[in-house]
Each structure stands twice: as structure tokens, then as C-alpha cells.
From Swiss-Prot:
Optimum pH is 7.5. Its cofactor is Zn(2+). Keywords: Calcium, Disulfide bond, Fibrinolytic toxin, Hemorrhagic toxin, Hemostasis impairing toxin, Hydrolase, Metal-binding, Metalloprotease, Platelet aggregation inhibiting toxin, Protease, Secreted, Toxin, Zinc. Optimum temperature is 37 degrees Celsius. GO terms for molecular function: calcium ion binding; magnesium ion binding; metalloendopeptidase activity; metallopeptidase activity; toxin activity; zinc ion binding. Monomer. Inhibited by EDTA, DTT and high concentrations of zinc ions (>2 mM). Weakly inhibited by TLCK. Not inhibited by PMSF. Activated by calcium ions. This is Snake venom metalloproteinase atroxlysin-1.
Amino acid sequence: TPEQQRYVDLFIVVDHGMFMKYNGNSDKIRRRIHQMVNIMKEAYSTMYIDILLTGVEIWSNKDLINVQPAAPQTLDSFGEWRKTDLLNRKSHDNAQLLTSTDFNGPTIGLAYVGSMCDPKRSTGVIQDHSEQDLMVAITMAHELGHNLGISHDTGSCSCGGYSCIMSPVLSHEPSKYFSDCSYIQCWDFIMKENPQCILNKR
């Protein structure tokens, strides 16, 4: 129903390594981000959540935090930076870091769970792990899902015969669908915690 619509004002930060990976072409990076956000919008529309890109910051000179292969440390640093720096400059609900750094092990993204609207913890870090916009967009949708209180799908969760967004492992052919479990968990979190920042559009 429309009255339960929520709005996530999303801010995306691009680290210096990713800037260099795209040969310093900010326009190309921005185009990629817009494609990714459109995919995320589509994915979240069935959840009655609108994803609105409120800003992009590209670290074209140098990284403003220590980005490292240990994803938990990078997430911690990014959260602190968001809380003390970015939030003072730009109004937004959630921030995601895109990095060219190859995180340790099979990790391609990491985020806090059930943390939407928290100054430090409404954040995630995403490895730019594929040439395909879809693959990285689904990874970001997945990490944002954790911020919205959604945990990984178990065997009984389904999204109509596809590989769902909150699957513990990214499929080679991911879908833009959340499972029935994800919908229930997301709205349980929203109804119980009532994160204020996503009630309005900026």
C-alpha cells in the first residue's frame, strides 16, 4: 500500500582505486552508478521501498579512509568517516562505498544488519567485482538489504524459481527479486524499529 512506501536517500562513495581503475573517467563511473541504482530501484520496488540517489563522491585525489582487504576494518573506517565527515556535509539516509580493492576470501560486500538511519552503521562496502552493472548492483542491493534488517535466505525462501537477492552466494545469473522471507524480515524491521530517516524523500 502507498502509505507504507519508504524512501532510502542513498549516497555512493567511490574510492581512489576505483577512480584509477576507470582511468580517472568520472563520467564513466557516474554512468555505471546510475545504471546500478536503476537496477536497485527495480529490485526494491516490490518491497515498497524507493531508492533515491542523493549524491556521488569520487575520491579522485586520494582515499579519505584506509581502504584495505580486510572488509570489516574497511566497513568500520567508512562508518566512522560517514558519521564524522559526510553526514555533516550531505543529507542522506545510507552510504555505500564502492572499491576496487579485492576483499579477503570470497567476500564481495559487507554491511551492518538492521542499522538503517544509524549515523555510523547505515553503511556498506562493495567490491567492484564484475564488469557487469547487474552483478555489482545486486551486491549493493544485498548489502543494503542487511542494513534493512534482512538476513540471508535459507532453503525454504523463494522468489519464483530464481536466485534471490539475499542468497548467501551470488549466482552467475542473479535475479532482481527478493524472496518472500526478505519481504517479511524487511517489514518486520521497519514496523518494529520504525527508522525515521526513510519516511520522507529529501
